[in-house]
């Protein structure tokens, strides 16, 4: 042994070994307790160490799953996996390599990410206090403490009671929704999370769901809770509405003597919601077949799945941040009255919860007002209509669910034919300006006398408040458009979401741009052309972003647009919101019976307008090719407009916005040319519009930027598609689809060799 080695051995023996502390809960993070990897070392042929007998992250280091086993012993409650590619165990991973190469580092990062998703997968009560990674769409966002499972333990005839359809009928619960139900009694500190489709009826005291307070009422509220979105948490409201304690129907239902129905308990009735949207489980939209779970629920109700204890699929709950609660509670103040019409504008970046808060704002305004107006400025993700449309909607009932679950007919709307105002900023502002003027002069003040409606929940009916949902484009041109919209709307309250902080590089040679500030020029009475700017006091609320979850990355905005488009064309809309929306997704669009409408001068549809880039290049003889299989907007004319008496003219601009009202969208499934006796075109239309609205349509507007998604063109039923084709036709006979591959260099299937770097090769 050399002298240097002897000195090292002596020093190692003399130095005391530090005691290994026992692993505690505080020392283990939720995302997984992994030791830091050792720095990379250069591998050489002679000095490479021997392969390690166990992995870098060995079993003596507690993992995230071991942490939860030590706290709540939830490993036995796990009944579902996040994906088929998830690992079966989180134990140590052995490797025959050195462990310091780039390949090993990538594998270890992959297992670390899987452990992070496992932490989101477990159905347990866990307070998440760690920050998300700065990479990806979640940059520097603090996760809120959330409870994934319900704080409710159902006990038969104590806080949970099954009610038959006959008992509901004898109690005069005749609202057109057949089927049995259950009555749940919630204490002050209890909550109930439910996935699926159900009807909610508050029976005693006010409850809270989706940041919305619901008081006892004879009305039943349809709730849509797919697992692709945050699940609603039902809990007693923090403040109870005076004079609305118990519903009279509760006295007509015979409940067991042991059932808890004291005055401090919150009682609610849950029934089946047979609307048809659960037909998505048949495979109409790929990736969304399992968002409604199974048909039979554990409570014996169809499509109702309470999240109590363990749950077979990964879910995450809907949470209300404190700043949201403060902003919503301010709506009950005395300034929201007849003297000050409420105009609220919600703005914020993408994925901040802007549309979710705006929907909660709308629902809470409906507690005081008979009707509330909604101005949609987001072309990409419309709340009550399909994309590429800006419009005004008038609502008298709350919307409890994601946007694709409550499509409604607009009061006034305009079709731009694109998902972004980048290509048409001028037309975008003109359409919104007209909608704001239409609201101020036609909808804001009603002719109804408020005394006629004071007996119905004491709601205000003399004027209609407005909620403006803006787009998430907050930089460059998007910021300029947002400022113009705010100046046109003149909101009384602005709800602004905090922008995500960006990492600014401050190295050598880089400087940060100073913030831009606007200053109003002083008023000079010497110049009569200059008018003083009258500024009203606008209350501004700063809101924190919605809590994020790793499960949100499963679906992109493009996926949600496809889901919204397919469900829109499978829906059946009604002129009034009192009749709920229904869906028929039992068969694909290619098998749906269409409307046959004639297109021509003096026919049902008289004119066609093409908008968007490249529309001016479509010749008149190519019009059938441009319309066949396209998504078009059906519009009505509200006044006379001097135009050429032809069906289509190349390069013709559409009528002014004040003369056109978009009724809805339609798909031209096919068309056929007329003959000499009956010239024109016969169109086969698929549209969710009712016949009364379809008969008002006079013109078609088509944009080349909006196309029908692929799931709307195929037969997605089991056995509907094979290698030869679908519907008994070969692929070469199927319109609008090209299944054959491209004959290009490198387009063939790649083959991988497995004998590279073998010995003797």
From Swiss-Prot:
One Pfam family in the UniProt entry: CLP1_P
Bias kind Basic residues: ranges: 39-55
Keyword entries, A-Z: ATP-binding, Kinase, Nucleotide-binding, Nucleus, rRNA processing, Transferase
Regions crossing the membrane: none
Top-level taxon: Eukaryota
Cellular compartments annotated: Nucleus, Nucleolus
Composition-biased stretches (Basic and acidic residues): 112-125
One GO cellular component term: nucleus
InterPro entries in the record: Clp1/Grc3 (IPR045116), CLP1_P (IPR032319), P-loop_NTPase (IPR027417)
Protein name stated in the entry: Polynucleotide 5'-hydroxyl-kinase GRC3
Naturally occurring in which organism (per UniProt): Cryptococcus neoformans var. neoformans serotype D (strain JEC21 / ATCC MYA-565) (Filobasidiella neoformans)
Source taxonomy: Eukaryota, Fungi, Dikarya, Basidiomycota, Agaricomycotina
